[in-house]
Amino acid sequence: MLLGRIMLPLLLVLAACLPDHSSGRKEGAHMVSDKPVRVGLVLSHFGLGDQSFNDMQYNGLIEAYRRFDIHTVFRVPRSEADTDMRPVFDELIHREQCNVLIAGEGFQMGPLVYELAKKYPDVYFIVFEYKAGVLPNVINAEFAQNEGSYVAGFLAARFSVTKKIAFMGGVDIAVIKDFEAGFRQGMQRGEPSCQLVTEFVSRLPDYSGFYDPKKGYEMASRLYKEGADIIYAVAGGTGNGVIQAAREAGKYVIGVDSNQDHMAPGQVLTSMMKRLDVAVLRLIEMRIAGTLRGGVYRFDYKNGGVSLTEMEYTKKMFSEPLLRELRTLEKQMADGVITVINTLKG
């Protein structure tokens, strides 16, 4: 296994603040029963510096370390193969003695998490957006990406000049389709005449669509040439290529997961943030308090689990009436006034 390779200067600084306390209990460490809380995070093999899913979770871990002074450690497997992921989890359980494990990539780590949870009932496993039954020590963290996408779709439809907007999904899995459904519904509210073109970078069982910025760039360049003036890129690291294409074409993109507005100031209209950092911090805090139980925890507009950015570089591009509408829409979303399609609801 590999320690996370940090690709951004900021993350280099943050990593220096996250020592590996493998020698045992720290003075003043927070306790659960008679054991100190020890948290291990397994990121996807793409590692740190993705400006997306991995970085958000890592930031939450950093904040938990700073606030609670607990043992924290992260690892990055060489690949998504079971033969590479399993030893990482084993190391965190046995050598690091972690009693809270966060699986940073639910759709690929989920099956292994459920297997290990049955074997180690005293370890709490947090997995994002993957559910295969109910276990007392498995925490399923879900996000209302449909709600955030609805608001993003409304904004895109009101801002688009060509009235042709594209949705680029990394892989055709259920959670990505939930993004698309909310985005489409929001577009319809914003401007019913808008056309939405939906494409996926890869299809199951191929997950490379989340880690292929070159293909994202090529697809986005084509979509812009075909008349789309905004692309909602829900594709992990592949979205970095979409942002590059927007920059070169003079078009617009909506980022996802983390705040990507700075990656092309003035052309990333906003980012629909799934606050994995908030989720990681809150769930660790609950474990420290002894209130964490197995089950589903949903992070939505109401509790700060999803939101648009402050649009630092683009707010001046929107009219004041549109910004007022957007603020009203966000309040309605938080208050539960708006019902958004949820394609994941069983």
What is the meaning of each model-derived region?
Residues P9-L10, R282:
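Intrinsically disordered and other compositionally biased segments
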